[in-house]
């Protein structure tokens, strides 16, 4: 066992082998492991794609087609990378919703939650700048629309936009800096993920019952490693269906048209995993108000440890909260649908109602429901 006591090996052993894990965690706890698999896949495929990609407005689109047609298994690398981004967001969104359901944001794991929200923000930034790189119509116009939102910042907004673009429009300088940042950001996400894991293991994992128990725990290996690998096999099958049978179903057909600044697409939409936030942005007619609401929709998650008022972690014992939780999930799905629809009625009104409920849930319902539950428990109602 002297081998295990070596510094690097002991870290791996403490966090992945002998790590004490609650015996009652189920497959909802698989998604942290799956998100790390997605990140590794994205980094590896991204490195190989970068070897053949050219970050120049005249060559970017052609270099992507070169990867698809001429590079050995280039089509596979690209489809794994593009669909891998979607899989990454699916896994992370489920991971977040699981945390909301089982109260993973409640102390002592509140800093784990805050770091997780930071990872989500970094993922959104990375995915956005990555969407620009193929230099199709949706890449160019999506970049133009989203970066233009910064101009809503009073006094300095226009200067920041010019600085982001590296000129007076989305052009070669923009593409170069986006490529550079897109290559760097996954490694930043990996570093922050290690911090996320280290802080989690300081206080230990939660469990479906939401109780702290240092007695009913077993080592992570082999019990939960085997469970994680079973989840990974199911995930790979699901992932492979998209890669091999429907590789473009989650993309936009306009991005197979080379970027043309003289022709505006009929309907500019971001990737599907941004649609709920995009719907919140469009729900407010005022530009600065919409941008503030969109940013707040993400930032508010980081403040949940200080907003909630309940003493019960798990929703298994909170029937009243559970009802409002599932309404919130429905609103998120509705916002995702509305984000892909034209800006016209009734879509605008539906988006506004769903956006209002989203914020009411976090700002009003979370603290109020906790106090109502406390009152009902005290009087045994």
UniProtKB/Swiss-Prot annotation:
Residues bound to a ubiquinone: 201
GO BP term, pick one: mitochondrial electron transport, ubiquinol to cytochrome c
Coiled-coil residue spans: none
One GO MF term attached to the UniProt entry: ubiquinol-cytochrome-c reductase activity
Gene Ontology CC entries for this record: mitochondrial inner membrane; respiratory chain complex III
Cell compartment(s), UniProt: Mitochondrion inner membrane
Record bears the keyword Transmembrane helix: yes
Matching PROSITE patterns: CYTB_CTER, CYTB_NTER
Signal peptide residue numbers: none
InterPro entries: Cyt_b/b6_C (IPR005798), Cyt_b/b6_C_sf (IPR036150), Cyt_b/b6_N (IPR005797), Cytb/b6-like_sf (IPR027387), Cytochrome_b (IPR030689), Cytochrome_b_C_euk/bac (IPR048260), Cytochrome_b_N_euk/bac (IPR048259), Di-haem_cyt_TM (IPR016174)
Keywords: Electron transport, Heme, Iron, Membrane, Metal-binding, Mitochondrion, Mitochondrion inner membrane, Respiratory chain, Transmembrane, Transmembrane helix, Transport, Ubiquinone
Annotated residues for binding of heme b b562: 81, 182
Cofactor note: Binds 2 heme b groups non-covalently.
Transmembrane segments: 31-51, 75-97, 112-132, 178-198, 224-244, 288-308, 320-340, 347-367
Function: Component of the ubiquinol-cytochrome c reductase complex (complex III or cytochrome b-c1 complex) that is part of the mitochondrial respiratory chain. The b-c1 complex mediates electron transfer from ubiquinol to cytochrome c. Contributes to the generation of a proton gradient across the mitochondrial membrane that is then used for ATP synthesis.
Name of the protein described by the UniProt record: Cytochrome b
């Amino acid at each position: 066992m002297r081998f295990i006591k070596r510094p690097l090996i002991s870290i791996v052993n403490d966090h992945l082998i002998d790590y004490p894990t609650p015996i009652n965690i189920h497959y909802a706890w698989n998604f942290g492991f799956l998100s790390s698999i997605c990140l590794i896949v994205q980094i590896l495929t991204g490195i190989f794609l970068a070897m053949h990609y050219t970050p120049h407005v005249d060559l970017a689109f052609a270099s992507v087609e070169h990867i698809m047609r001429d590079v050995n298994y280039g089509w596979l690398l690209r489809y794994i990378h593009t669909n891998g981004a979607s899989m990454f967001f699916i896994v992370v969104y489920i991971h977040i919703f699981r945390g909301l359901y089982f109260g993973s944001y409640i102390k002592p794991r509140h800093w784990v939650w805050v770091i997780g929200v930071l990872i989500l923000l970094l993922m959104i930034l990375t995915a956005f700048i990555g969407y620009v790189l193929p230099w199709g119509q949706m890449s160019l116009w999506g970049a133009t629309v989203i970066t233009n939102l910064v101009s809503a910042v009073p006094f300095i907004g226009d200067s920041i936009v010019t600085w982001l673009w590296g000129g007076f429009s989305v052009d070669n300088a923009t593409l170069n800096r986006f490529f550079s940042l897109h290559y760097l950001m996954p490694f930043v996400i990996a570093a922050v993920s290690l911090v996320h894991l280290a802080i989690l293991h300081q206080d230990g994992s939660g469990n479906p019952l939401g109780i702290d128990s240092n007695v009913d725990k077993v080592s992570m290996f082999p019990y939960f490693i085997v469970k994680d690998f079973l989840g990974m096999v199911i995930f790979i099958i699901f992932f492979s269906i998209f890669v091999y049978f429907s590789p473009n179903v989650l993309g936009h057909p306009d991005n197979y048209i080379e970027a043309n600044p003289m022709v505006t697409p009929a309907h500019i939409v971001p990737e599907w995993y941004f649609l709920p936030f995009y719907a919140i942005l469009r729900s407010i007619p005022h530009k600065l108000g919409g941008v503030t609401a969109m940013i707040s929709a993400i930032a508010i998650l980081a403040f949940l440890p200080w907003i909630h008022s309940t003493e019960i972690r798990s929703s298994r014992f909170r029937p009243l909260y559970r009802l409002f939780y599932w309404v919130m999930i429905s609103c998120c799905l509705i916002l995702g649908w509305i984000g892909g629809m034209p800006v016209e009625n009734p879509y605008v009104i539906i988006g506004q109602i769903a956006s209002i409920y989203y914020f009411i849930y976090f700002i009003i319902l979370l603290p109020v429901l906790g106090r109502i539950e406390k009152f009902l428990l005290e009087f045994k109602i």
